[in-house]
């Protein structure tokens, strides 16, 4: 078409319903004298009428479901990989719990050896550990698979793992007392110990 660009713009304005009366008059005069523009305008009107006539057509209710059913099934491994990529923190925590929980489970069932912390004024006989009356034991005391009898003073925490604790009337503990006789308690204790070791490694001088 060699007609002015303005005429094409007026066609679009007319089809959009935005044309002014004076501009519509200009367009009509041109269409009466220009066969090419008149044919082009007629084709545009037919196209718009066709689109409007099909605007009420809707896809069947089950169209989406049918299309999805015909698509290739995603491999289960791929969906698992996608879940791990979108939930990295949860995945890491789950793996940590599985690995650490399994290790703690084996440790709990296989470790039956008696052990005790190494303070010099603890009295150890067979599997019995005694804090003598009048003695003050400095630091945390841990007894595994044995018995702890407290007659004196412990200046720290007490942890008895899979054992027994007796405190005489004169016995004293300045810190916390924890008795661990269940697998869950053991797991929690080991996790706390590991966390404490990490903190100590980053803060060797005990600074806050």
Curated annotation (Swiss-Prot):
<dbReference type="Pfam" id="PF13490">
    <property type="entry name" value="zf-HC2"/>
</dbReference>
<keyword id="KW-0862">Zinc</keyword>
<comment type="subunit">
    <text>Forms a heterodimer with cognate sigma factor SigW, which probably prevents SigW from binding to DNA.</text>
</comment>
<feature type="binding site">
    <location>
        <position position="37"/>
    </location>
    <ligand>
        <name>Zn(2+)</name>
    </ligand>
</feature>
<keyword id="KW-0812">Transmembrane</keyword>
<dbReference type="InterPro" id="IPR027383">
    <property type="entry name" value="Znf_put"/>
</dbReference>
<comment type="similarity">
    <text>Belongs to the zinc-associated anti-sigma factor (ZAS) superfamily. Anti-sigma-W factor family.</text>
</comment>
<keyword id="KW-0346">Stress response</keyword>
<comment type="function">
    <text>The anti-sigma factor for extracytoplasmic function (ECF) sigma factor sigma-W (SigW). Holds SigW, its cognate ECF sigma factor, in an inactive form until released by regulated intramembrane proteolysis (RIP). SigW and RsiW mediate cell response to cell wall stress. RIP occurs when an extracytoplasmic signal triggers a concerted proteolytic cascade to transmit information and elicit cellular responses.</text>
</comment>
<feature type="topological domain" description="Extracellular">
    <location>
        <begin position="109"/>
        <end position="208"/>
    </location>
</feature>
<feature type="topological domain" description="Cytoplasmic">
    <location>
        <begin position="1"/>
        <end position="87"/>
    </location>
</feature>
<keyword id="KW-0805">Transcription regulation</keyword>
<feature type="transmembrane region" description="Helical">
    <location>
        <begin position="88"/>
        <end position="108"/>
    </location>
</feature>
<feature type="binding site">
    <location>
        <position position="34"/>
    </location>
    <ligand>
        <name>Zn(2+)</name>
    </ligand>
</feature>
<keyword id="KW-0804">Transcription</keyword>
<keyword id="KW-1003">Cell membrane</keyword>
<dbReference type="GO" id="GO:0005886">
    <property type="term" value="C:plasma membrane"/>
</dbReference>
<keyword id="KW-0472">Membrane</keyword>
<dbReference type="InterPro" id="IPR041916">
    <property type="entry name" value="Anti_sigma_zinc_sf"/>
</dbReference>
<feature type="binding site">
    <location>
        <position position="30"/>
    </location>
    <ligand>
        <name>Zn(2+)</name>
    </ligand>
</feature>
<keyword id="KW-1133">Transmembrane helix</keyword>
<feature type="binding site">
    <location>
        <position position="3"/>
    </location>
    <ligand>
        <name>Zn(2+)</name>
    </ligand>
</feature>
<keyword id="KW-0479">Metal-binding</keyword>
<dbReference type="GO" id="GO:0046872">
    <property type="term" value="F:metal ion binding"/>
</dbReference>
<protein>
    <recommendedName>
        <fullName>Anti-sigma-W factor RsiW</fullName>
    </recommendedName>
</protein>
